[in-house]
Structures are given as C-alpha cells and as structure tokens.
Amino acid sequence: SNGDEIMFADYDRTWGTYGITIDSNGLNYQGDDDSYIVEYGTDGQAVHIVYSGATNGWIPILDKAVADAPIPGNQEGIFGFGNTGSLTGVTNLVSNAGVVATDVAAVGTARSRLAGCEYGGDKGIFGFGDTGSASDITNLVSNAGVVASDITGVGTARLYLAACNYSSNRDKGIFAYGYTSGAVSMSNLVSNAGVVAADVTGVGTARERSAACEYGGDKGIFGYGYTSGNVSITNLVSNAGVIATDTTGVGTARRFLAACSYGEDKGIFGFGYNGGMQAITNLVSNAGVVATDTAGVGTARYVLSATQYGGDKGIFAYGSDDSTPLLSLSNLVSNAGVVASDVTGVGSAREQSAACSFN
C-alpha cells in the first residue's frame, strides 16, 4: 500500500563484487514496469525505497554509499639499527606521547643505511641496508614493537634506499631507489602480511640517500636524494603502489634527509645535507604537493630517521652534525607540521638508522 517502506544496506561491503537486484514483483519501479532491471552494486551502499502508488510504484528516497570510518594512524614508533661507531641492531620504541625509550637489545643482523615502513595496518618492517656489503634481509616488527629475526632477502640487495606505507587500508609498504654499484630506481612492494615482492622495474630518476613518507591517507611520496649531485625531485606513489614519473623539485636539493607523515594525511621532509648540515623542512599536502622551505628548528643534521606517532604526529631522531658525529636528540612534529626544538637524546647515539610506526 502507499507509504510502505523497505530498506537495503550493504553491511558486509560486498555489493561491489556481488551486487543486488530488486524484483518489484509486478509493480512499477520509478515509473518503469517490472521488466526494468533494478541493480545496485556499490560497496557500503544503503537504499531506502517507498511505495507511492501504481503509476510510480516503488521510488528510492535514499541511495547513498556510506564511507568507511577514517583509519587512524599508528600510535607508536620504533627507531632501529644504524651505526654507533660500529654497526648495531638496537631499537628504541616511541610512545604515543613521543617519548623515546632506552635501548632494546638487538635482534637481527646489525646494519646501517637501511629503510623501514609500515605494513598490515599496525606493524612494521626494516629492510635492506649495509652489513659491510649490500643486504636484502628484512626484519618484521609486531604490533607490540617486537623485532623478529632475519628473513632471507627478496629483491636486489642495496643500501641508501627509502620506504613508505601505501594502500586504502594503510596496510602495505614499498621500498624503492637506493645504491648498489651506483644509484638505482627499482622498487619492492610489501604485502599486508609483510612479504616483500621481487623487483619492479624502476620509474623516475635513479637515486640514493632519498627519503619517503605517506600522504593523502593512502598514498606515498619519495623525494630528494643524490644522483651525480643533490636533487629535489619527487615521485608520487598511488594507493596501488605504482610509482609515478618525476615531479619537478621544490625546496632545497639535498640528501641524507628523513621524512614521516603527520596530521593523518600529510607528510614532512626534514633536515639533510647539501654541502652543509640543514634543519629546513618541506611540508607535503594531502594532495602530494611539496611546499617551499620552512626555516629550520632544532640542530641541523643529516643521516637521521623519522616516523609518525600518536596517530597524527611525527618525530625526527638521531643523526650526525658538524661537531658531533653521533647524536641521540629528537624533534617532535605537531599535527600541524610544526617542528619543535631539540629534546635531549635517549638511547645509543647513532646515525644511518631507520624508523617506522606500529600499533
């Protein structure tokens, strides 16, 4: 009868795969007779129909795909490996308040010049690096911040590479660029189970000593580095893990910098070296656009690392400067991308470490 209502909702979010067909059982649907095929096929869709008489039949009064709730960033971080004067595998956890903890005994092969990123939504991975020669081993990080033993490498052994998280669920990662006997541009995807895939042919200018971070909630960006000189070019990573061609550089060309996400959907490149130590930063918008230089805060340094913490904040830590070859200080990044002054270091002073977030 007139005014009758029916509601359909895709609670399982599978209509994009299976869809539904509504049979109006001899009645019209939006003025069309029963021979008209009515199909809906969008994940998360909700349809609310009402009967409005023989002429119009059933008519939809609501047809809307409900968006997934935003996936929050990880709460804690971890800095690991590096060079303390000799190669090390120690790690330092970062709390959800940005407090760096004391050293955790090494697990896995000591090395430097490696990279780290997130996978699985709440876990991390350290990979590749320099053990005295180029390496392709990886070490998974649990959602409790526990580093696992070595996993036999996949992909070209290299050092001076970078890595970041990507995908709509924030559950995959990518390692890219680096150095073997020269600068390279290949990449290796990391599945949501932490499995590293074989080399993908490089896109963009081959380079080493670059940095990478997430932006837009589901994408990544590699930037800066060194070819035959310092560069500021960037390469965006889609939410399918596809690296785009070079984007003309913005900001001071430099190498040995670090990057992390902040504000849940933005990123920041910071510090580095271009003939002298730098403390400048460059913010990355949620569209992957890199901003011009922001004046440096904190001790100018290079060969440091960075990660997010607290869901929407970041931290730069460790590294080296002109007067102190090994540092342990850190600088917090607010959810507005503002870098704070130096925090007294905790843990073994070192350079050329890596970092990622978890939990």
How would you describe each model-predicted region?
Residues 1-68:
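Acidic, glycine/polar-enriched metal-coordinating patches/loops
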Residues 36-40, 48, 63-359:
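Kelch-like beta-propeller repeat domains
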